[in-house]
């Protein structure tokens, strides 16, 4: 093919720009976590060793993002938004995304269990949303 034929062919074919894929939108939580009052426990629950071991195992097994250890200790906080019903029982939970759905759901389930019979009724508003925070702490 001659250069003239190649140039003629190129002129006949319009250049179509390749679309650049748009960056995915940054997911933002519709929950204002800082504005949620803490869930009013009678006795603040602490995760047991077995609970912590489960979280560590799930983080490894699912290749979830892990917090950086500080002086040989690692801490992971799981926040859960909690809706309390008129009977002072948990009606809904929404775990805060930490990049590990198994641990998020586990934390939400623990909050339901920890709240059962362990809330101060005179500090709970019917239909109110609260924040429960669980801290899993272990040695690397």
Segments predicted by a language model, with ranges:
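Charge-biased low-complexity segments
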Residues: 2, 11-140
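Intrinsically disordered, low-complexity protein-interaction/activation regions
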Residues: 6-8
């Amino acid at each position: 093919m001659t250069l003239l034929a190649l140039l003629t062919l190129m002129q006949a074919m319009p250049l179509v720009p390749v679309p650049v894929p748009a960056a995915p939108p940054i997911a933002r939580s519709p929950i204002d976590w800082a504005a949620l009052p803490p869930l009013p426990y009678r006795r603040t629950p602490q995760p047991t060793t077995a609970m912590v071991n489960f979280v560590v195992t799930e983080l490894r097994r699912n290749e979830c993002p892990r917090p950086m250890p500080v002086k040989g200790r690692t801490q992971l906080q799981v926040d859960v938004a909690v809706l309390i019903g008129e009977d002072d029982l948990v009606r809904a939970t929404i775990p805060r995304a930490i990049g590990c759905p198994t641990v998020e759901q586990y934390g939400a389930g623990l909050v339901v269990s920890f709240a059962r019979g362990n809330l101060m009724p005179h500090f709970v508003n019917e239909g109110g949303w609260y924040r429960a925070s669980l801290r899993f702490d272990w040695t690397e």
